[in-house]
């Protein structure tokens, strides 16, 4: 009896091992063969390029070592109707679908579109290609790929499915007519999986209240839960899901903290011009809204005498008055004094910018333009007064109010040279007179001594 049991046990276990070897033949020997080096690295890379199916791991121990999590649920297929050629191909590819005639005849473009969808990953990673209850789903070539680079494996899987689909279509003989509402219910499990995947996604109308012009309308055969999105809405939905916080106004993100520098305030001002009043009032507390004083906040949020207006007046009132009489301070040259005053005004403006609340970009540009105009006007007035003073010192141009600046400069140079020559002449005459005085004094002393 023991001998019979020993003989029957391997015989009973033989079909399991044979079936397992047949199912995982690609993972049994061919996948391990390139890892045996043949004394050269070139042979290893050459064998790896020649092999059509090459998973990155030699055995299941690598998969257990990395312990990769399953892929996240993907968005539903972009195909809007269930009666489309992609759905018919899916129904024929699905192991659970009922084979009711091969799914009809398709053109080359439809077949290429189905292959593109399969290679794109929208159908390879779903449950209608590999049954999750089956043991082969755990040992699938694509799931075994720990680096998710099984493009060749996906290509082979798609080619096998297409071959089986063409064989089924040849066996069916004549193509079946177009599917109606009854044909759409052949793969109810696929509908459940697709509706479950669609229910986990966010409706684009919730995230984006604005209507999408290129959104496709569902066909009559499609279920309400499996309505597909257009490429633009699908990309917007993926970006909204990946963002840390999704709000009805996507332009109003990251605006809760007030800026501290002038560059940050300018960026904040550009963002505040694009958002509406309601979003600003929700994000900013009442104290910040009253201090900001933005023109879009309404009349109640801006006090009649805000510190912003007072500081702007402070810049204009404390400027140097050149029409006032000169003070007792040290007099600098005209150009240097203009530079000092302009630097003082710019320093006051920069301090007021740091202390004031953020303003709009238009107000900032107006302030800069006004400051530049004030400084330029002061420079021109100072230069004009200097020329007028120089003209008044020249005897030839003293009464000529329309004398040009070039004439004033030339006459002033000639007058300075003549004055210097006259000065030298007067100095020489002074020396002669002093010597003459000394001689007369000496002669007077001699006369006094002789008369005594």
Curated annotation (Swiss-Prot):
Motif UBR5-degron: chain residues: 368-377
Residues bearing PTM Phosphoserine: 19, 75, 84, 94, 164, 172, 174, 306, 327, 342, 357, 360-361
GO biological process: cellular response to hypoxia; cellular response to UV; cellular response to xenobiotic stimulus; chromatin remodeling; chromosome organization; DNA damage response; ERK1 and ERK2 cascade; G1/S transition of mitotic cell cycle
N6-acetyllysine, modified sites: 156, 161, 170, 288, 330, 336, 384
PTM per Swiss-Prot/TrEMBL: Phosphorylated by PRKDC. Phosphorylation at Ser-342 by PIM2 leads to the stabilization of MYC. Phosphorylation at Ser-75 by CDK2 prevents Ras-induced senescence. Phosphorylated at Ser-75 by DYRK2; this primes the protein for subsequent phosphorylation by GSK3B at Thr-71. Phosphorylation at Thr-71 and Ser-75 by GSK3 is required for ubiquitination and degradation by the proteasome. Dephosphorylation at multiple sites by the PNUTS-PP1 complex promotes MYC stability by preventing ubiquitination by the SCF(FBXW7) complex. Ubiquitinated by the SCF(FBXW7) complex when phosphorylated at Thr-71 and Ser-75, leading to its degradation by the proteasome. Ubiquitination is counteracted by USP28 in the nucleoplasm and USP36 in the nucleolus, both interacting with of FBXW7, leading to its deubiquitination and preventing degradation. Also polyubiquitinated by the DCX(TRPC4AP) complex. Ubiquitinated by UBR5 when not forming a heterodimer with another bHLH protein, leading to its degradation: UBR5 recognizes and binds a degron that is only available upon heterodimer dissociation.
Gene Ontology, cellular component aspect: chromatin; cytoplasm; Myc-Max complex; nucleolus; nucleoplasm; nucleus; RNA polymerase II transcription repressor complex
Compartments (UniProt record): Nucleus, Nucleoplasm; Nucleus, Nucleolus; Nucleus; Cytoplasm
Cross-link (Glycyl lysine isopeptide (Lys-Gly) (interchain with G-Cter in SUMO2)): 65, 156, 161, 311
GO-annotated molecular function: core promoter sequence-specific DNA binding; DNA binding; DNA-binding transcription activator activity, RNA polymerase II-specific; DNA-binding transcription factor activity, RNA polymerase II-specific; DNA-binding transcription factor binding; DNA-binding transcription repressor activity, RNA polymerase II-specific; E-box binding; identical protein binding
Chain residue ranges for the region called Disordered: 214-378
SMART domains noted in UniProt: HLH
UniProt domain bHLH: residue ranges: 367-419
Chief location bin: nucleus
UniProt-annotated glycosylation sites, renumbered to this chain: 71
Known partners and oligomeric status: Efficient DNA binding requires dimerization with another bHLH protein. Binds DNA as a heterodimer with MAX. Interacts with TAF1C and SPAG9. Interacts with PARP10. Interacts with KDM5A and KDM5B. Interacts (when phosphorylated at Thr-71 and Ser-75) with FBXW7. Interacts with PIM2. Interacts with RIOX1. The heterodimer MYC:MAX interacts with ABI1; the interaction may enhance MYC:MAX transcriptional activity. Interacts with TRIM6. Interacts with NPM1; the binary complex is recruited to the promoter of MYC target genes and enhances their transcription.
Protein name: Myc proto-oncogene protein
Organism: Canis lupus familiaris
